[in-house]
């Protein structure tokens, strides 16, 4: 049995057509079903529907053989015990700093609000900058507006939400896309099955971007 961990939302919507290329189609619509374990048209493949931030944990600990996770989540989580064999080139965005339009960056200690605490620590350590990291789980844009932080670090797609709140994207940190991840033990135990799936998905990704 192959178990694939996915999270609802944009990643799921973009991943399902790629899985369909490999003949893997859920027997129920994951967006409408309340089930968290969903069979597929292949008897030996099932989907686990979990939170985006939990996908690497399920895969690392072997509760899922494979998963699809954003590079932002993998950068924050660390990705130990995982293979990352394929960039699916879906859910594209950028990880960036952002701040209020026209604000001058303070020379002293910087206050940065983000849910990507580990990424922020590494980023500013590489710059030799002292920062106070404030962990938030959502509505990052509020932090600079009410004086909680000087900057935020968040994923930026169109930038419309930032601009609507008087903020602007500033420093680029990383390009983000969704990656296929594989449990290392599963790769050894089910190598032929998993490698065949990787190859099929790679062809589907390449075909989509050629078109």
Curated annotation (Swiss-Prot):
InterPro entries: ATP_PRibTrfase_cat (IPR013820), ATP_PRibTrfase_CS (IPR018198), ATP_PRibTrfase_HisG (IPR001348), ATP_PRibTrfase_HisG_short (IPR024893). CDD domains: PBP2_HisGs. The keyword Transferase applies. It catalyses: 1-(5-phospho-beta-D-ribosyl)-ATP + diphosphate = 5-phospho-alpha-D-ribose 1-diphosphate + ATP. Keywords: Amino-acid biosynthesis, ATP-binding, Cytoplasm, Glycosyltransferase, Histidine biosynthesis, Nucleotide-binding, Transferase. Disulfide bonds: none annotated. Pathway: Amino-acid biosynthesis; L-histidine biosynthesis; L-histidine from 5-phospho-alpha-D-ribose 1-diphosphate: step 1/9. GO terms for molecular function: ATP binding; ATP phosphoribosyltransferase activity. The keyword Transferase applies. One of its GO terms (biological process) is L-histidine biosynthetic process. Its EC number is 2.4.2.17. SUPFAM superfamilies: Periplasmic binding protein-like II. One of its GO terms (cellular component) is cytoplasm. Pfam families: HisG (PF01634). Lacks the C-terminal regulatory region which is replaced by HisZ. NCBIfam families: hisG. Catalyzes the condensation of ATP and 5-phosphoribose 1-diphosphate to form N'-(5'-phosphoribosyl)-ATP (PR-ATP). Has a crucial role in the pathway because the rate of histidine biosynthesis seems to be controlled primarily by regulation of HisG enzymatic activity. Heteromultimer composed of HisG and HisZ subunits. This is ATP phosphoribosyltransferase. The lineage of its organism: Bacteria, Pseudomonadati, Pseudomonadota, Gammaproteobacteria, Pseudomonadales.
